């Protein structure tokens, strides 16, 4: 059933030998790569060995049933255990997203709906900050443009695991959970500015990209155009009298990143480069996916109410994820960061689709 695992066992043994060689660790980047692959294969190898041993134990127990009927109960228990190991191994063999261990850059953009959309973008920001707090992640607002009523026209946040270097265990990074948040989020509610009590519909867009390390993306200095300008706050009010804001354009691709929140031009440049690296990595991955027959759908790039992935209905206290048919009536709790059930529904649907395609 799991013939392909034998090849993985050989690769695992080969990696173990390499990692035991001190000279391998002289190249830290290569050693990290080998360690990562070894950590990915270890649970597969361990589960397969347990699965195989359980099969042998079942055959042995069956041989004793004729002489001692008590072994029939043991056979039943072992068969149940083997079924559980079979399913666990199937899930472990689902093709992994290579970015699942990474931290992310989260961007929320106000869209259709004007001021109400900007206020909703602020609600989404608070929801994600609360979720990160619940699961023990670290957050840092990189750049933001506030609206006049206190919402956000645009906000970018770095979300990291506790160590700030991605996941320590395979598949446990921020991207593994947060990648399902990318798309258009629609809200239905009575705005605070509505005097007639009418329900309005507006939308905000969420873009999630894995945060790239310098080794992930090669950027040449002569491919960049760096512009500096004066920072401004909500309503166009000046918050800085020097040209400290930075906009970086990657000329070969046209990808742009900017930052104005930091106090100095150097700090803004560093943050803008951080965003640019992540966007270039995401663009490269999407291009690879298109060439691989669109194995994973790209995130929504336009904030259009018709392209929604999720609806937040305040009058009914209802949250709906239209991709997986998830629906719950605890919107107040979701907006306070209780996202686990909804995200898990997306994880399960994604795993099922990958299993079916494997």
Curated annotation (Swiss-Prot):
Where is it chiefly localized?
A: cytoplasm
Post-translational modification here is noted as:
Methylated by PrmC. Methylation increases the termination efficiency of RF1.
Mind listing the UniProt keywords for this protein, alphabetically?
Cytoplasm, Methylation, Protein biosynthesis
> Cellular location of this protein?
Cytoplasm
Alphabetically, the GO molecular function entries are: translation release factor activity, codon specific
Looking up SUPFAM superfamilies in the UniProt record yields: Release factor
- Modified-residue entries (N5-methylglutamine), positions: 237
Say yes or no: keyword Cytoplasm present: yes
Q: Sorted alphabetically, which InterPro entries does this protein's record hold?
A: PCRF, Pep_chain_release_fac_I, Pep_chain_release_fac_I_sf, Prokaryotic/Mito_RF, RF-1
Q: Which PROSITE patterns match?
A: RF_PROK_I (PS00745)
The cellular component terms of Gene Ontology attached to this UniProt record, alphabetical and capped at eight, are: cytoplasm
Matching entries from Pfam families are given as: PCRF, RF-1
Q: What does this protein do?
A: Peptide chain release factor 1 directs the termination of translation in response to the peptide chain termination codons UAG and UAA.
Which NCBIfam families is this protein grouped with? Answer: prfA, PRK00591.1
Q: Which family does it belong to?
A: Belongs to the prokaryotic/mitochondrial release factor family.
Which protein are we looking at? Answer: Peptide chain release factor 1
What is the species listed in this Swiss-Prot or TrEMBL entry? Streptomyces avermitilis (strain ATCC 31267 / DSM 46492 / JCM 5070 / NBRC 14893 / NCIMB 12804 / NRRL 8165 / MA-4680)
What does the organism's lineage look like at the top?
A: Bacteria, Bacillati, Actinomycetota, Actinomycetes, Kitasatosporales
């Amino acid at each position: 059933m799991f013939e392909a695992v034998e090849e993985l066992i050989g690769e695992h043994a080969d990696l173990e030998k390499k990692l035991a060689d001190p000279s391998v660790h002289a190249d830290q980047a290569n050693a990290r790569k080998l360690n990562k692959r070894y950590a990915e294969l270890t649970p597969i190898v361990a589960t397969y060995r347990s699965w195989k041993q359980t099969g042998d134990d079942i055959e042995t127990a069956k041989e004793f049933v004729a002489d001692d009927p008590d072994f029939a109960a043991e056979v039943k228990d072992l068969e149940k255990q083997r079924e559980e190991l079979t399913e666990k191994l199937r899930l472990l063999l689902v093709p992994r997203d290579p970015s699942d261990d990474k931290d992310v850059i989260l961007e929320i953009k106000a869209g259709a709906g004007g001021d109400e959309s900007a206020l909703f973008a602020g609600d989404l920001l608070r929801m994600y900050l609360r979720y990160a707090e619940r699961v023990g992640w670290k957050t840092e607002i990189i750049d933001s443009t506030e609206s006049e009523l206190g919402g956000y026209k645009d906000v970018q946040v770095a979300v990291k695991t506790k160590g700030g270097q991605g996941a320590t265990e395979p598949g446990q990074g921020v991207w593994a959970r947060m990648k399902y948040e990318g798309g258009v989020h629609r809200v239905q509610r009575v705005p605070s500015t509505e005097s007639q009590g009418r329900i309005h519909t507006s939308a905000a867009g969420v873009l999630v990209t894995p945060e790239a390390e310098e080794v992930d993306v090669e950027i040449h200095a002569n491919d960049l155009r760096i512009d500096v300008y004066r920072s401004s706050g909500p309503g166009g009010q000046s918050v800085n009298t020097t040209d400290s804001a930075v906009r970086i354009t990657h000329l070969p691709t046209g990808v742009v990143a900017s930052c104005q929140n930091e106090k100095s031009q150097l700090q803004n440049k560093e943050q803008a480069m951080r965003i640019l690296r992540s966007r270039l990595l995401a663009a490269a991955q999407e291009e690879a996916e298109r060439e691989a027959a669109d194995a994973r759908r790209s995130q929504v790039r336009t904030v259009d109410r018709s392209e929604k992935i999720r609806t937040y209905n305040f009058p009914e206290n209802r949250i709906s994820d239209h991709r997986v048919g998830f629906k719950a009536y605890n919107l107040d709790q979701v907006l306070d960061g209780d996202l686990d059930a909804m995200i898990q529904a997306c994880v399960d649907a994604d795993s099922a689709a990958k299993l079916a395609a494997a």
